[in-house]
Amino acid sequence: MDTQRDSPSLGRWSLVLLLLGLVMPLAIVAQVLSYQEAVLRAIDGINQRSSDANLYRLLDLDPRPTMDGDPDTPKPVSFTVKETVCPRTTQQSPEDCDFKKDGLVKRCMGTVTLNQARDSFDISCDKDNRRFALLGNFFRKAREKIGKEFKRIVQRIKDFLQHLVPRTEA
C-alpha cells in the first residue's frame, strides 16, 4: 500500500513551494528603490511637468538622512539640478545629456518613497540662490576679520600711549 509520503509528486511540490518561498522575498526586495534611484525618478517627473525648454539633470545630491526601513514612508530629500542641452521633447535620458553652459540651476526639496510600486514624490524646485548666500557669508566673514583687526589696532595704540606717559619714580 502506497502512502502519500512515498509519493514522488509530494516531494516535487515541497521543492516547488520551498523555491517559491525563497524567490518571493527577492521579488519584494527588488521593488525597493535606492535613495538615488528615487531621486532620479523624481527628476524625471520634474522634467515631465516642467514648462522649460530643456531637461534638467542631477547636479548635486545632499547626503542621505538617517531613515527608517519602511519603503512606503516618505523620505526627505534635497538636491540640485541643472539645465542640460537636451530639449524636453527628446526621448533621451537626462543622464545622457551634457549640462548647458550657464544653464539654469534649481534647488529642489521634498519627499520621495522608495517603494517602486508607489513611486510617489512631492518635490518643489526654486532657482538656486546659494550664490547669494555664499556672497553673504563672504561679507560676514570679511566684517568679522575687519572687526578683529580693528580691535587689535586699537589695543596697540593703547599700549603705545601707555608707554609714552612719563613714569614718576617714587
Swiss-Prot record:
Transmembrane segments: none annotated. One of its GO terms (molecular function) is lipopolysaccharide binding. Proteolytically cleaved by proteinase PRTN3 into antibacterial peptide LL-37. Proteolytically cleaved by cathepsin CTSG and neutrophil elastase ELANE. Residues 31-131 form a propeptide. It comes from Nomascus leucogenys. Belongs to the cathelicidin family. Coiled coil: none annotated. This is Cathelicidin antimicrobial peptide. The keyword Cell wall biogenesis/degradation does not apply. Disulfide bonds join C86-C97, C108-C125. It is found in: Secreted; Vesicle. One of its GO terms (biological process) is defense response to Gram-negative bacterium. Keywords: Antibiotic, Antimicrobial, Cleavage on pair of basic residues, Disulfide bond, Immunity, Innate immunity, Secreted, Signal. The lineage of its organism: Eukaryota, Metazoa, Chordata, Craniata, Vertebrata. InterPro entries: Cathelicidin-like (IPR001894), Cathelicidin_CS (IPR018216), Cathlecidin_C (IPR022746), Cystatin_sf (IPR046350). The keyword Signal applies. Antimicrobial protein that is an integral component of the innate immune system. Binds to bacterial lipopolysaccharides (LPS). Acts via neutrophil N-formyl peptide receptors to enhance the release of CXCL2. Postsecretory processing generates multiple cathelicidin antimicrobial peptides with various lengths which act as a topical antimicrobial defense in sweat on skin. The unprocessed precursor form, cathelicidin antimicrobial peptide, inhibits the growth of Gram-negative E.coli and E.aerogenes with efficiencies comparable to that of the mature peptide LL-37 (in vitro). Residues 150-162 are annotated as: Active core. Residues 1-30 form the signal peptide. The cathelin-like domain (CLD), which is the propeptide part, does not seem to exhibit auto-inhibitory function, as it does not inhibit the antibacterial activity of antibacterial peptide LL-37. GO terms for cellular component: extracellular space; vesicle.
